[in-house]
Amino acid sequence: MPFTADFETTGETNLEKDGCVRVWLWSLVNCNTREEWYGTTIESFIDELKAQKCDYVFFHNLRFDGSFLLNWLVDNGWIYGTHYTCIIDKLNVWYEILLNLGFACRIWDSAKKYPGCSVQDVAELYGIKGKEEKPNFDIYRPIDYQPTEEEIEYCLQDSRIIAYAIKEDWDNGYKGMTLSSDAFKEVKESIGGYMGWRKHMPKLTKEMDKFCRRSYKGGWVYCNPKYQGKVIEDVNVYDVNSLYPYVMETKPLPVGKPFPGPPNKGELYIVKFTTEFSLKPKHFPTIQVKHSMHYSETEYIKETVEPLELTLTSVDYELFHKHYEVYYERDHKY
């Protein structure tokens, strides 16, 4: 059963006087029954999670609220791997805090379900009443501070709004941790479930998977040497909305089980080969290599200093020939 929660925390006023900040108010809402609870310490919050047997709890922006929770767990002797675990990636993106409360209590980030949306945005998205004006929270609050009814109501609003949205999603079968996982689940169901998915995207052998992954590249980011190290004014910035979905809808993409050997005309492919080359005049460099003693991983190569092994998709291979003078190629493997 899903629940939603929110923390209100002290700010600079308390930090300057006490040397620390803390949670001074929390709210908890049952998404199905709309029952509500609130309290003033993380300890009482944990107790309520146990009492209500909360197996899923959503905070909107887990990185903020979760940092107070993890700090409290460490300070109070909870042992990582025994009493709790968490999923936080190298970019400090928070996905889950898992508490062992005698049962598994999974704390997730509702901002991953509604990316880029504030709580107010979520209210507008679902056509429900939004948040009221925020009370003055920038005051000093001693340890025994008792929140006002106005402050309690404001804290509960956040949890109510997200609770409404989560219930709508769960009622429609969208019970994933993130919007991406919900979308992935729907795609699989639309093509025949797991078996249909595996028909289009078969599981590869480790060797074949490794070969394909070598061709994977990120976006092209490049600064013209003509402008490097200079302050440029009156710059125009352009963006393309929904470029990834556009490409997925209109351009050919690889599906199905790949096969070794030269491709037929018009087919997508990945090719590994050894080559040497230099950049054509008035063209852009497009090739980067990893784990090389001769080139920086962030450097686009203008000219090779030794034979270089590349693994490229057919799209990048075509681009490679368009922008580089290729001296030779050998040992092609498709």
Spans of model-derived segments:
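Ser/Thr-glycine-rich phosphate-binding loops at phosphate-binding pockets of nucleotides
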Residues: 7-14
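Conserved acidic
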Residues: 2-4, 18-61, 66-334
